């Protein structure tokens, strides 16, 4: 424990917070162009084929971004909007694409949790 003299002489230094979304340069989203589309298998207790896109951002950085939802219409050279947010069972994938913006179509079959997948509200006939 520090004495009161030591506390007055040396102020405590703040811990630096590590930025995990460096490629976005502090922005909420960035535009990018798909270079490659691939599937990755998740970490151990899980088993699936997760869709991942290799994206070159407008900042010239190349990242891997997860494509959420079932099915997608992306192809190489499609323009996407990328946000931060890691996929827990895919190591090294720290970004997600935003559905329903630019060239990435929304998940049309969704009825619940539509805002995360860019789906419009279905028309109700009365």
UniProtKB/Swiss-Prot annotation:
CC annotations in GO: mitochondrion; small ribosomal subunit
Function: Protein S12 is involved in the translation initiation step.
Keywords linked to the UniProt accession: Mitochondrion, Ribonucleoprotein, Ribosomal protein
Gene: RPS12
Compositionally biased spans, kind Basic residues: 12-21
GO molecular function, one term: structural constituent of ribosome
CDD domains: Ribosomal_S12
Protein name, UniProt field: Small ribosomal subunit protein uS12m
Entries under InterPro entries matching the protein: NA-bd_OB-fold, Ribosomal_uS12, Ribosomal_uS12_bac
GO biological process assignments: translation
Entry annotated with the keyword Magnesium: no
Recorded family membership: Belongs to the universal ribosomal protein uS12 family.
Region (Disordered): 1-21
Keyword presence, Ribosomal protein: yes
Any single Pfam family the record assigns to this protein: Ribosom_S12_S23
Top-level taxon: Eukaryota
Biased composition (Polar residues): 1-11
Subcellular location: Mitochondrion
């Amino acid at each position: 424990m520090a004495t009161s003299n030591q506390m007055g002489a040396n102020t405590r230094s703040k811990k630096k917070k590590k930025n995990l979304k460096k490629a976005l340069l502090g922005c909420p989203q960035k535009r990018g162009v798909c270079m490659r589309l691939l599937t990755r298998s998740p970490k151990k207790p899980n088993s699936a084929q997760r869709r991942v896109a290799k994206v070159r951002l407008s900042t010239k950085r190349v990242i891997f971004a997860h494509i959420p939802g079932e099915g997608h219409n992306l192809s190489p050279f499609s323009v996407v909007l990328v946000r931060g947010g890691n996929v827990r069972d895919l190591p090294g994938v720290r970004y997600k694409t935003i559905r329903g913006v630019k060239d990435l179509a929304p998940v049309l079959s969704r009825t619940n949790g539509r805002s995360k997948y860019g789906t419009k509200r279905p028309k109700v006939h009365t």
